[in-house]
Amino acid sequence: MLVLIAGLPGTGKSTIAMHLARRLRATVLRTDVIRKQLFPEPKYTEEEKELVYRVTFLIAEYLLRAERNVILDGTFYKRSLRERVYQLAKAMKTKLIIVECCAPEAVVKQRMEMRAKKKNIPTDADFEVYKKIRDQFEPLQRPRVIVDTSNPLEENLAEIMRYIRSRTKAARRSGRRG
């Protein structure tokens, strides 16, 4: 299974991914972490972004071939990036689950302020980055579950698991894996 967790910075994607990974026995590939491993002081150029996503997709493909569940955790704010995820799931003949994380802007701002005080956080995204990506975000159009991460974590995880079960049942009824 391939799970795409997309959304703006500060919307709780990594928290959802980490907890969901435990339930699905999945490996989480965080674009923030991969970026920091490739570029200790990233410039966020298009070339850097392309390499980060290329490496992310290569690792995901390797894990899917090994029949592992994979969670992709990143903004995936461009339709073209998400299209690559859809193509990967199709090529690997695996189920694709899409989770869109959102949160009220005031909550995001508060999270960003708290995040700025912490050490060893793999993301450099601050509220200015949030606003920039918000303005460039291309809406998701595929079937997905949308979770407001200002709601309790357990409620969101339960909603996601219900969605996964419903997509699994629908795929079985139609004779498809994904």
Segments and roles (model prediction):
Residues 51-96:
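Glycine-rich phosphate-binding loop used to anchor ATP phosphates in small-molecule kinases
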Residues 9:
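The conserved Walker
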Residues 12:
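Conserved glycine(s) of the Walker
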Residues 15-66:
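Conserved substrate/cofactor phosphate-moiety recognition/catalytic segment
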Residues 2:
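Walker A (P-loop) ATP-phosphate-binding motif of ABC ATPase nucleotide-binding domains
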Residues 5:
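Hydrophobic anchor at the beta1->P-loop junction of P-loop NTPases
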Residues 92-112, 147:
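Conserved phosphate-donor/acceptor-positioning beta-strand/loop module used by diverse small-molecule
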